[in-house]
Amino acid sequence: MTAATHEAVAVRGRWRLCGWCAAAVLAEAGLYASYRGHDARFHWFTHFFVGAATALAAMTVVVVLRRRPVARPLVWPLAAHLFAMTPDLLFTAGYAHRRWMDLFLGHISVHFVPGRNWTWLAVFLTALAAYLTAVDRRRSLASEP
């Protein structure tokens, strides 16, 4: 592969990553807007932090077991966020919240954790640090002779 071809592939990869980032941001903006009238900041952040932290924990396990980063890493937190907020989607369709909805990543219980969203932010940042550490460790092990 020539240097020019390698550079073209790298540029295409960067644009693809930008596309995934833009899609994830637009999707999350749509989810945030879906909470209008229901204390959007509190509810969106709660389920985002819980879903994304769960996804990052799963991604960390995959990195450790497969010894490489996960494919499409932005899809995992978005999918987990959607899963965590499923009871709210059901609520907008007319279904009242029930205790069994805690099956969706603790949908009801997560609102009653001491510290509320500050606690979930700390959990999210810890999960993010664990994932990035696992990815970095795998890359450094792969680059050793």
Which residue stretches match the model-derived regions?
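N-terminal membrane-targeting hydrophobic helices
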Residues: 1-145
